[in-house]
From Swiss-Prot:
Name used for this protein in its record: 3-deoxy-manno-octulosonate cytidylyltransferase
Catalytic reactions of this protein: 3-deoxy-alpha-D-manno-oct-2-ulosonate + CTP = CMP-3-deoxy-beta-D-manno-octulosonate + diphosphate
Organism listed in the record: Vibrio vulnificus (strain CMCP6)
GO biological process, one term: lipopolysaccharide biosynthetic process
Gene name of this polypeptide: kdsB
Disulfide partners: none
One Pfam family this sequence matches: CTP_transf_3
Keyword entries, A-Z: Cytoplasm, Lipopolysaccharide biosynthesis, Nucleotidyltransferase, Transferase
């Protein structure tokens, strides 16, 4: 099985300007993500950016860049442009890895690609069991419910499924673990253009979850439990400092 990883790397960030180039142990953040994707066994790793400063930094460490429009409204639109510009075949598997996850385990990058290859869905993703009471009711921890074959029934910021009896007894964490969605996706390349040409659905607008568009239009997303739980990504200066400390502790 071969697959390509695309890493969106926008320079502009409200909470952390210049995020892709933030220094972590002497390397820009985007290089850490790139190296994790290489370790996952990707046939090709492409960094998608709309900023020449990012492109120049990637050239220094020998990565491949695809310059994209600065006017995309979503990461999926940027991904569709990469597929078109790079001439990626419709049946090829493309994994979208966020550019702010320098510690993402290579194992789950490969796992989501293998998950898609083994299913009939046009799209696949991963989840982890929720083990924290705080996450059960946290709207920032997106929940996913699947059918018996692992296909997503729904994604929500709400607590789903609602364990009526256990919650009534004050039991938040039960044997029926809720699943938290991890924001890593694999696509069949030809499906990406279909996806971005659909009109946004009312459900995705309500939940602010773009993946609900796929379910709204009757397509499937396959979900597996991740082999490893990835560390949190970098959204703030505090997150960046934590990652620096974690990497320093390992070296």
């Amino acid at each position: 099985m071969s697959f390509t990883v695309v890493i969106p790397a926008r320079y502009q960030s409200t909470r952390l300007p210049g995020k892709p180039l933030a220094d972590i142990a002497g390397k820009p953040m985007v290089q850490w993500v790139y190296e994790q994707a290489i370790q996952a066994g990707a046939q090709d790793v492409i960094i998608a950016t709309d900023d020449q400063r990012v492109a120049d930094a990637v050239a220094v460490f020998g990565g491949k860049v695809c310059m994209t429009s600065p006017n995309h409204e979503s990461g999926t639109e940027r991904l569709a442009e990469v597929v078109q510009l790079m001439g990626i075949a419709d049946d090829h598997i493309v994994v979208n890895v966020q550019g702010d996850e320098p510690l993402i385990p290579p194992s789950i990058i490969r796992q989501v690609a293998e998950n898609l290859a083994a299913s009939s869905a046009p799209m696949a993703t991963l989840g982890v069991a929720i083990t924290s009471e705080e996450e059960v009711f946290n709207p920032n921890a997106v929940k996913v419910v699947t059918d018996k074959e692992g296909y997503a029934l729904y994604f929500s910021r709400a607590t789903i499924p609602w364990d009526r009896d256990a919650f009534a007894r004050g039991e938040v964490l039960t044997e029926h673990s809720l699943m938290r969605h991890i924001g890593i996706y694999a696509y069949r390349a030809g499906f990406i253009n279909t996806y971005v040409n659909w009109q946004p659905s009312s459900l995705e607008k309500i939940e602010c979850l773009e993946q609900l568009r796929v379910l709204w239009y009757g397509e499937k997303i396959h979900v597996e439990l991740a082999k490893e739980a990835p560390p949190a990504g970098v959204d703030t200066p505090e997150d960046l400092e934590l990652v620096r400390e974690l990497i320093a502790a390992k070296s």
